[in-house]
Amino acid sequence: VHWTEKERTIITGIFSHMDYEDIGPKALSRCLIVYPWTQRHFSCFGNLYNAEAIMGNANVAAHGIKVLHGLDRGVKNMDNIVATYAELSILHSEKLHVDPDNFKLLSDCITIVVAAKMGHAFTGETQAAFQKFLAVVVSALGKQYH
């Protein structure tokens, strides 16, 4: 993947200003609510009965934060994202048996939450760079499935 300096600046800028404790829980909650079949991977998280329960679930919040910190690893290793996520790809495919399409669904939810938080600053150029980054991460996480 070729990253322009502008893309690198946009992506690192988004993550340097990101409130992980706000964005992470909101993004994962949104994914579990909008795509309820993704909940099957989180049965150990307790009550996921409805939107209110999901949004108030401490385990969902903690995992959402963990996901964003995982993305931060990709930001720090943009020139070697596949290797950065190799272990996570194996874990999600071989042990957790996560449908790789779920990574794309979550990345879409992350984009929506980040866009809502950034408002007018989330320009088309910003969205293009951010979604390119997430697409590369999603592809890397799915490598073990191929």
UniProtKB/Swiss-Prot annotation:
InterPro entries to which the protein is assigned, alphabetical: Globin (IPR000971), Globin-like_sf (IPR009050), Globin/Proto (IPR012292), Hemoglobin_b (IPR002337), Hemoglobin_oxygen_transport (IPR050056)
The protein's assembly and partners: Hb1 is a heterotetramer of two alpha chains and two beta-1 chains.
Cellular-component GO terms for this entry: blood microparticle; haptoglobin-hemoglobin complex; hemoglobin complex
GO MF terms, alphabetically ordered: haptoglobin binding; heme binding; metal ion binding; organic acid binding; oxygen binding; oxygen carrier activity; peroxidase activity
Other facts: This fish has 2 hemoglobins: Hb1 (major) and the minor Hb2 which constitutes about 5% of the total.
SUPFAM superfamilies attached to this UniProt entry: Globin-like (SSF46458)
Pfam families referenced in this protein's UniProt entry, alphabetically: Globin
Binding-site list for heme b: H63, H92
Keyword Iron: yes
Descriptive protein name: Hemoglobin subunit beta-1
Globin domain boundaries: 2-146
Tissues where the protein occurs: Red blood cells.
Family recorded in the similarity comment: Belongs to the globin family.
Entry annotated with the keyword Membrane: no
Signal peptide extent: none
Keywords noted in UniProt: Heme, Iron, Metal-binding, Oxygen transport, Transport
GO biological process: hydrogen peroxide catabolic process
Role summary: Involved in oxygen transport from gills to the various peripheral tissues.
